[in-house]
């Protein structure tokens, strides 16, 4: 709640509600897992069959039979794929499981993340300053071209995956692994206790389907809805796309009395360095210095 002195914050923990009065707020809640819309109800109704990669390690997968599908082409997808690939074989690389492993992505390929010394200059305060002062159209265009600066797979992981696939191919092992790029998931439904996934190839527009016993969606993260801020939403300025307007020093532009700072919610305004942990420390220092009124860091 916005108040004349700043904000009133209500926090519920273990069934108990606490009330805090403050002059300023820092929102650092991060992002939440994103699951394609056609899979959301299936994930809710059949969590043992469909889950986001964020939950991959919390509950061991069972029923690894038939088709097992990994969606996505980032680092998380690659690591899930490697783990499932290894579970098909024993220590002597003999096939011990009969499930078929499918790795699909709508991206044009399974590409490495840009991690060269000069490429990393995009994750610097200087580049953040440059990006901030572009207009909205320029920012949107730049972000579309920079996906592999913060998405993609590490070169080592790609090499490890290729080595595993190569070693099994030259050994004449039965093919149990399939990789498909440019495959856009357009529909999913549960049929006969399996998840039918319908894809459309981005180039040929040909449709095909897979009936999966298990689906792991390594499909990234998205900005949460921030329902807890609904009392102050009307006071916050937004751009034409509905994004929060954020100053260069990470303050929301709003009409309330105090300041609201944000962490990891400014991709649209500050660029690809937003989720970077190194820049996160720099961003936190700038916020702390403003709260203190002097340069501690």
Annotate each predicted stretch with a short phrase.
Residues 1-75, 79-297:
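Flavin (primarily FAD) cofactor-binding/catalytic cores of flavoenzymes
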